[in-house]
Amino acid sequence: MRKGITGVLLALALTIGAGSRAQYDRDYFYYVGRSFMIDNNFEDAIRTLNILLRFDDDAYEGYFLRGIAKYNLDDLLGAEADFTTAIEKNPVFTTAFTYRAITRSRLGNYDDALSDFAEAIELRPDLPNAYYSRGVTRLLNQQFREAIDDFDKFIRQENKVSDAYLNRGVCYLYLKDTTQAYANFETAIRTNRENPMSYNRRGELEMKQQRYKEAEADFDMAIRCDSNYLLSYFNRAIVYSSTNRPMQSLADFDRVLQLDSTNSLTYFNRAIVRSQIGDYNRALEDYDKVAFYSPENVLVYYNRAGIQAQLGNIESAVEDYSKAIELYPDFANAYLNRSRLRYLLKDESGSRRDRDIAQRKIAEYKTRLSDSTYSIYADTTHRFDRLLSFDANVAGSTFGRIASKSADNRLALLPLFRFTLRTPDSLSTVTAGRYHSQREADFRRRIDNRYLTLTARESNVPADSLVMLDKRYARELMAEPASWELLFQRGITQTLIKQYTNAVGTFTSAIDQYPANPFLYLNRSTTRAEMIDFISSIDNSYQRITIESDPAKRLQNSQSRTYNYDEAIADLNKAAKLYPDFPYTYYNRANLMALSGKLPEAYNDYTKAIELNPAFAEAYYNRGLVQIFMKDTRKGCLDMSKAGELGIPEAYEILKQYTALDR
């Protein structure tokens, strides 16, 4: 059914022209967009609302709905922009103020969020929801008393919402009023006995008060309400560990990892429990996982070094202590432990040097006892083998960035555009369907091959068919004078069967016959680039844009051998001179510039491509990646938002990752 509706929409989008505004049914598109959103099909909702807004720029409800769809896809910057447009079109749009405030709150822009809430409340002081959402924002902004006041106002009108009591209880907890916090958690439970969060919150308070029996009962109830509620398994595991039941603790940590296999904090805690029962090898495996997901956390290496030493891996232990020291040079304990291990390795001078540094750090610590962060790492009596609570990474814990994303999380540029052979299908390159170049259309007509298309997608012609087609072109070239059109097609088939050197030669022969044709240079360029990528893959040395947990890292190349795209770029320079208004030339050149590490030049070329084709989704996507690498994350995410709006679903995956990191 959904595919059928999408097909109807696409057909309508193609038939509606600038002069056929009367055919456009505003209410229909609005209704279909809402229907997609009710089904949580937010990407189709955005595509539908794009059609609505293309023909009715004043449809403020359309911007509002599209903003909600983007919000649900974690495209917060795009959502904020759409809510802003809705407000500009309708300055008394109360709900748009509320939703923009919520979006700005999630972006950490609390001041502007509070201003929006004030506008919404001034417009409609009788509506309770704005008070609740402002209370949450004030809670996040650590304005706890003001947040309590907002939750009070909300509860006066809506006294059956358990989350309001829950959040008010959290505010009291931060104000050290555990009595009021406990009372609010109890009211939340009475209001909704099926909400696992209420039991979990009360259990956390009881756990901090070492009332383990009551805490365990609350975590049991939370799990009974929702068997997939991760937090309560995690907290109950800590209760089991605190009450000397390590096997039950491990079972709960195992369950957490079944629900979230990338949860670094759980691996860390499970490693501690495993080491406590002498299961050092499996503890080491867990610490390896933590190091993989959170490569910049000092405690991972410190604790893993201790396990390595227990297992007799002295050199590995020294490496881990060295890494801990590299991350935190004032870590006196790490110096002391490395000193002992270096002594065992007969490195007496290194051992003595570490011991002297440690003693100096300890002396400095004694003069700076008021600096708690410093003292933790310089205090030789401090233990680092205690389990960490789930909010440790957001509550100023020494564990820091335990929940950071994988260090090996790689995101590649979208590929180059080139002329290739594809059998017709229902899918098309996102941009290709919206951009028309008469010169390119005339070129394809001249070639007269119904399978020829300009795309960034791979050919879908079977390999054996490509080989047969290439042999046919070879016979034709031998039987008659070689035309540039036939040479061009032979170059394509040679590229597709990975005869790159021959393909470059064939394209060169075509260029010799028609040196003023920009499309011949375009394809020779992409073939040269593909040849470089193919060679680099054989060397196991991919050179590509990657995004890592450390945003300071740049283009990666795992081998010392490097490859350059100079000849491919030179072809694109020639193509740009011959046809300066063709956006795909600049897009391809930008890709090669990025792969060569020339990020500012890549940014400029993507921008030129977008100027020539404002609906160039792939260019927005790749420019977004480049800007993220240039540490302009906000602008990069704005480009990702536009790419997603224009139809690239991968953009929302990146936005989700960066939204998660900023929370």
Each model region followed by its residue ranges:
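Helix-start (N-cap) detector for alpha-helical repeat units in TPR-like alpha-solenoids
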Residues: D25-D27, Y60-E61, T94-T98, P128-N129, ...
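Canonical tetratricopeptide repeat
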Residues: Y31, L65, Y99, S133, ...
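Register position in tetratricopeptide repeats
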Residues: I38-D39, N72, R106, L140-N141, ...
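Structural marker of alpha-solenoid helical repeat scaffolds
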Residues: F55, K89, L123, Q157-E158, ...
